[in-house]
């Protein structure tokens, strides 16, 4: 193990070139530090900053495009929903109109059928009445002839 007291005793200033010697080493270290900062700035920080800026611009442009597309999609959605509502209303009107038309057609056909049936019943009644009258007349004639025959037989 390293003893702390030995480190302290070894770091004591025993002449020139100690721990706090301010000859040319301090400006040299400062120049090295500045050169290292310039090199790091040129080689590392500037490319990183440009990449970060490019990514930031890329993200912002894509975000802008995405928000534009989203707003356009929302507009199209609203437009299509409006058109869908209009089409539904038109379809409902068409359905009600066609139902009315079919109902009117059905009523007309029922009226025509009713008139036809009434006419048919009327002609059948007239025909039956005529046949009844003919049958009654023929029956009346037969009865008359039978009566004449009966009278003729009785008078013999």
Swiss-Prot record:
Cited Pfam families: ATP-synt_B
GO molecular function: proton-transporting ATP synthase activity, rotational mechanism; proton-transporting ATPase activity, rotational mechanism
Keyword Transport part of the UniProt annotation: yes
Membrane topology: Single-pass membrane protein
Xref: CDD domains: ATP-synt_Fo_b
Superkingdom of origin organism: Eukaryota
InterPro entries the UniProt entry points to: ATP_synth_b, ATP_synth_b/b'su_bac/chlpt, ATP_synthase_B_chain
Entry keyword Transport: yes
Localisation: Plastid, Chloroplast thylakoid membrane
GO CC, one annotated term: chloroplast thylakoid membrane
Residues that span the membrane, as ranges: 24-44
Keywords: ATP synthesis, CF(0), Chloroplast, Hydrogen ion transport, Ion transport, Membrane, Plastid, Thylakoid, Transmembrane, Transmembrane helix, Transport
Disulphide bond pairs: none
Role summary: F(1)F(0) ATP synthase produces ATP from ADP in the presence of a proton or sodium gradient. F-type ATPases consist of two structural domains, F(1) containing the extramembraneous catalytic core and F(0) containing the membrane proton channel, linked together by a central stalk and a peripheral stalk. During catalysis, ATP synthesis in the catalytic domain of F(1) is coupled via a rotary mechanism of the central stalk subunits to proton translocation. Component of the F(0) channel, it forms part of the peripheral stalk, linking F(1) to F(0). The b'-subunit is a diverged and duplicated form of b found in plants and photosynthetic bacteria.
Family membership noted in the UniProt record: Belongs to the ATPase B chain family.
Other comment: In plastids the F-type ATPase is also known as CF(1)CF(0).
Complex and partners: F-type ATPases have 2 components, F(1) - the catalytic core - and F(0) - the membrane proton channel. F(1) has five subunits: alpha(3), beta(3), gamma(1), delta(1), epsilon(1). F(0) has four main subunits: a(1), b(1), b'(1) and c(10-14). The alpha and beta chains form an alternating ring which encloses part of the gamma chain. F(1) is attached to F(0) by a central stalk formed by the gamma and epsilon chains, while a peripheral stalk is formed by the delta, b and b' chains.
Name this protein carries in UniProt: ATP synthase subunit b', chloroplastic
Protein source organism: Phaeodactylum tricornutum (strain CCAP 1055/1)
Taxonomic path: Eukaryota, Sar, Stramenopiles, Ochrophyta, Bacillariophyta
């Amino acid at each position: 193990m390293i003893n702390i007291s030995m480190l302290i005793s070894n770091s004591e200033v025993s002449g020139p070139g100690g721990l706090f010697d301010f000859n040319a080493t301090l400006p040299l270290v400062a120049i090295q530090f500045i050169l290292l900062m310039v090199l790091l700035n040129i080689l590392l920080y500037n490319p990183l900053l440009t990449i970060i800026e490019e990514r930031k611009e890329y993200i912002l442009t894509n975000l802008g495009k995405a928000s534009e597309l989203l707003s356009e999609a929302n507009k199209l959605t609203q437009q299509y929903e409006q058109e869908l509502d209009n089409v539904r209303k038109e379809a409902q009107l068409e359905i009600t109109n066609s139902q009315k038309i079919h109902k009117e057609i059905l009523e007309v056909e029922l009226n025509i059928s009713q008139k036809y049936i009434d006419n048919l019943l009327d002609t059948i009644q007239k025909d039956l009445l005529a046949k009844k009258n003919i049958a009654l007349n023929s029956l009346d004639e037969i009865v008359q002839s039978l009566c004449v025959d009966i009278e003729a037989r009785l008078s013999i």
